[in-house]
Amino acid sequence: MDIVTLAEVAGNLNVVGYGLAAIGPGIGLGILIGKTIESTARQPELGGRLQTLMFLGLAFVEVLALLGFVAAFIFQ
């Protein structure tokens, strides 16, 4: 194999790696939002506080996706 072919394979693996890294935050967001909706349905008076906490958790979960995206570029 020549260098160009190896670079193409490494580039493709980075894309696959980011795709796998995005699965975790996607599942996390689904669970987070689902549980927030479930909790709001049980206790509607806490809806505002739960929504605030959900957005805070959403920010933390999205950091994982961004780290996966950045890692794909760093480890080329």
From Swiss-Prot:
<protein>
    <recommendedName>
        <fullName>ATP synthase subunit c</fullName>
    </recommendedName>
</protein>
<dbReference type="InterPro" id="IPR020537">
    <property type="entry name" value="ATP_synth_F0_csu_DDCD_BS"/>
</dbReference>
<dbReference type="GO" id="GO:0033177">
    <property type="term" value="C:proton-transporting two-sector ATPase complex, proton-transporting domain"/>
</dbReference>
<dbReference type="Pfam" id="PF00137">
    <property type="entry name" value="ATP-synt_C"/>
</dbReference>
<dbReference type="GO" id="GO:0005886">
    <property type="term" value="C:plasma membrane"/>
</dbReference>
<keyword id="KW-0138">CF(0)</keyword>
<keyword id="KW-1133">Transmembrane helix</keyword>
<keyword id="KW-0472">Membrane</keyword>
<comment type="function">
    <text>Key component of the F(0) channel; it plays a direct role in translocation across the membrane. A homomeric c-ring of between 10-14 subunits forms the central stalk rotor element with the F(1) delta and epsilon subunits.</text>
</comment>
<comment type="similarity">
    <text>Belongs to the ATPase C chain family.</text>
</comment>
<dbReference type="InterPro" id="IPR038662">
    <property type="entry name" value="ATP_synth_F0_csu_sf"/>
</dbReference>
<keyword id="KW-0406">Ion transport</keyword>
<dbReference type="InterPro" id="IPR035921">
    <property type="entry name" value="F/V-ATP_Csub_sf"/>
</dbReference>
<dbReference type="InterPro" id="IPR005953">
    <property type="entry name" value="ATP_synth_csu_bac/chlpt"/>
</dbReference>
<feature type="site" description="Reversibly protonated during proton transport">
    <location>
        <position position="62"/>
    </location>
</feature>
<dbReference type="GO" id="GO:0008289">
    <property type="term" value="F:lipid binding"/>
</dbReference>
<feature type="transmembrane region" description="Helical">
    <location>
        <begin position="13"/>
        <end position="33"/>
    </location>
</feature>
<dbReference type="InterPro" id="IPR002379">
    <property type="entry name" value="ATPase_proteolipid_c-like_dom"/>
</dbReference>
<dbReference type="InterPro" id="IPR000454">
    <property type="entry name" value="ATP_synth_F0_csu"/>
</dbReference>
<dbReference type="GO" id="GO:0046933">
    <property type="term" value="F:proton-transporting ATP synthase activity, rotational mechanism"/>
</dbReference>
<keyword id="KW-0066">ATP synthesis</keyword>
<keyword id="KW-0812">Transmembrane</keyword>
<keyword id="KW-0813">Transport</keyword>
<comment type="subunit">
    <text>F-type ATPases have 2 components, F(1) - the catalytic core - and F(0) - the membrane proton channel. F(1) has five subunits: alpha(3), beta(3), gamma(1), delta(1), epsilon(1). F(0) has three main subunits: a(1), b(2) and c(10-14). The alpha and beta chains form an alternating ring which encloses part of the gamma chain. F(1) is attached to F(0) by a central stalk formed by the gamma and epsilon chains, while a peripheral stalk is formed by the delta and b chains.</text>
</comment>
<comment type="function">
    <text>F(1)F(0) ATP synthase produces ATP from ADP in the presence of a proton or sodium gradient. F-type ATPases consist of two structural domains, F(1) containing the extramembraneous catalytic core and F(0) containing the membrane proton channel, linked together by a central stalk and a peripheral stalk. During catalysis, ATP synthesis in the catalytic domain of F(1) is coupled via a rotary mechanism of the central stalk subunits to proton translocation.</text>
</comment>
<keyword id="KW-1003">Cell membrane</keyword>
<feature type="transmembrane region" description="Helical">
    <location>
        <begin position="55"/>
        <end position="75"/>
    </location>
</feature>
<keyword id="KW-0375">Hydrogen ion transport</keyword>
<keyword id="KW-0446">Lipid-binding</keyword>
<dbReference type="GO" id="GO:0045259">
    <property type="term" value="C:proton-transporting ATP synthase complex"/>
</dbReference>
